[in-house]
Amino acid sequence: MKQYKSSHYIFNYNQYSKAEKDIIKISKYQEACYEYICNVLKIEPSFKIEYFLCDTPEEVGRIYGDDEPCNGFADLPNKIYAVYNEEVQCVGFHEDAHVISYLINRPNSCAIREGLAMYFDRKWWGIQNLDWTGYFINNNTYIAIEELLNDEVFFSYDCTITYPIMGAFTDWLIATYGIDLYLDFYKYENVFEGIQQVYKKIPKELNQMFVDYVNLFRIDELVEQRMDTLFHE
């Protein structure tokens, strides 16, 4: 693979690929994402993040070594494998947020870890996490936060539902209580203990406060129609 280096990244990509064509644009985009994540989390890696930009999900599995097709994932401490082609461009905030936030801690709940990554993403399929959460509440497909904090429950549902909910919840938590308290909470390995110690509430209470907040917003009719189409494809 060819290689391109920027201030905080090493990008590996195939010759004549879409990634090679766009490598300067990709580099500038990731550097901007990196700066924002570091500013919010108040931490900066001492290493460069190394991207492997692959043409297909199958190539991701082959280069990583497990032969499992995948669009993108972070391999700690500093590697990210991602598909980048004409149809799929798995770059942006998400995997970088994992790599950088794990320098603080890796809480024992996948919901919290993915929630922080989705907080930076803001959107799922181009639609705001908050709108998706309202849509799920209105259509009785919403899953309560206290349930999602359990990995067994979290993985039993499709990420189409769980990721936007946790992204919106994380956004609400940070906006309501501030980033400093959130970072204190993120340092707890046991998230149930962290919620009680930092926020002085139980997850069920926070969930109800969050749902009440989401219900303050009306979803635009055209956006809701688009969500219906995407969700049932």
Locations of regions flagged by a protein language model:
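Acidic/His/Gly-enriched intrinsically disordered linker/tail segments
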Residues: 60, 66-70, 80, 87, ...
